[in-house]
Amino acid sequence: MDNNKIIVFDTTLRDGEQSPGASMNTEEKIQIALQLERLGVDVMEAGFAAASPGDFDAINQIAKQIHSIRIASLARALEKDIKAAGEAISPAKNRRIHTFIATSPIHMEHKLKMTPDEVIKRAVEAVKYAKTFVDDVEFSCEDAGRSDIVFLKEICAAVVEAGARTLNLPDTVGFRMPDEIYNMVKSMVDFIGDRAIISVHNHNDLGLAVANTLASIKAGARQVECTINGLGERAGNAALEEIVMTIRTRSDEFAPLYTDIVTKEIYATSRLVASITGIEPQPNKAIVGKNAFAHESGIHQDGMLKCAQTYEIIKAEDIGAEKNSLVLGKHSGRHAFKDKLINLGFDLDDNEINEAFIKFKELCDKKKEIFDDDIRALVSHEIIKIPEIYSIQTLSTSSCNAGHSSAAVSIKFSDNIISDAALGNGTADAIFKVIDRISGISGELKDYKVNAVSQGKDALAKITVKVVFEGSSCATIGHGLDIDTMMASAKAYVSALNSYLSMKNR
């Protein structure tokens, strides 16, 4: 192994999906997986196979389609979890089972209700069983940040002897400071030596996930677990883009360490994840926030015009975030459109290009100026293959007195056009009520987000909804894209309905 290489373990599809409102369907996960492959991550944790049939299917489909990187599934230290993980990743060329058990006193006593000796025995059994499915087993000490270092060494030595190749030390609740993480990792690196790779997985509850990860690297960790845009439950995980660009930018601190990440794919990956999950990075987010390369201060602008390096330590083009210039128009041909897609990082087959080109031409008839971000949103939206059980045909709305609104909707279903109308508390509510009536399936709206894809009065509206439909305990996410915000809302709600029905019918 090259001891200067930092292995990038991306868990956007597993831990990142645990962000409230970030659940994804199988097709969406596949699109992100394909982009992560282009980004050049070393290991992709595709999900938690035992969590649900949907998770198992997504991991299995990704394992069939991704060839150049290692595919992992998480599994508790239980035979049924490990068996599910092994079966889900079986089509992959390079496979890993990532099994874990809690090691902190509070978790062992209150959650597991097990003694330390029992935990070690369970961990060893789990690793040995995982080895019957794959050669590459990773073991995680859940809540390592609050675990006793003597016990950590004892359990890690035992699982390494059982066959674990990677030892992961998560700061599960984001409690530790960089110096504390450094000391823990350094102690473990010195103890384990070259018997296994030491990995870290830091949460961001105190805003220290990236700082703790960088401290871990300096202490000798050679695998970092992270997510795109820092997605994750609670305050999120360490952001992949921040870790990678820090190592690259501060070579004075980290050389000769390096990653194999293709940094020019960072922006495209960030935008795809934001588009699919509906969770936009905050504007001032490092590296990928929309203000990351914006300068409003007159002094800063003057310096930038004279020499960009006066106020920018990273170039926008380094992460593939070139200026959002006008690109194509209504007279642009298919060949020019295909070239633009390649430049934006999309790898589509001929049928997908044709479908996207038709939608692009429709957009050109509605929108005067087309920007890169319009095309990114349009194509990302079109390549997510959700069966179109229902489709919006027409929509008209009007505002009434006392805050009420009405909506009339026509929907295509099984070659039939069904029309209806309803009143609601606001236009969106009226639209959703009509769709419920036409489909005969009522939904409860849990979240509704509006984003302008690009600049201008005629900017595309990207709507993301989160809906719980009757008979389901889980929320379904839908996306809609249109110049008209209410039409985008209708499309998003129908997208969620179609996604719910397609999953229900599997």
Curated annotation (Swiss-Prot):
Which PROSITE patterns would you find in this protein's record? AIPM_HOMOCIT_SYNTH_1, AIPM_HOMOCIT_SYNTH_2, PYR_CT
The record's Gene Ontology biological-process terms are:
L-leucine biosynthetic process
The record's GO molecular-function terms, alphabetically, read: 2-isopropylmalate synthase activity; acetyl-CoA C-acetyltransferase activity; manganese ion binding
Q: What is its EC number?
A: 2.3.3.13
Q: Give an example GO cellular component term for this record.
A: cytoplasm
Gene3D superfamilies named among the record's database cross-references = 1.10.238.260, 3.30.160.270, Aldolase class I
According to the UniProt record, where is the region Regulatory domain?
391-506
Keywords assigned by UniProt, alphabetized: Amino-acid biosynthesis, Branched-chain amino acid biosynthesis, Cytoplasm, Leucine biosynthesis, Manganese, Metal-binding, Transferase
Catalysed reactions, as listed in the record: 3-methyl-2-oxobutanoate + acetyl-CoA + H2O = (2S)-2-isopropylmalate + CoA + H(+)
Give binding positions for Mn(2+): 15, 201, 203, 237
Which compartments does it reside in? Cytoplasm
Q: Which residues cross the membrane?
A: none
Question: What cofactor does this chain's UniProt record say it requires?
Answer: Mn(2+)
What does the record give as the function of this protein?
Catalyzes the condensation of the acetyl group of acetyl-CoA with 3-methyl-2-oxobutanoate (2-ketoisovalerate) to form 3-carboxy-3-hydroxy-4-methylpentanoate (2-isopropylmalate).
The record's subunit annotation is:
Homodimer.
Would you identify the family this protein belongs to, as annotated?
A: Belongs to the alpha-IPM synthase/homocitrate synthase family. LeuA type 1 subfamily.
Q: Which named protein is this?
A: 2-isopropylmalate synthase
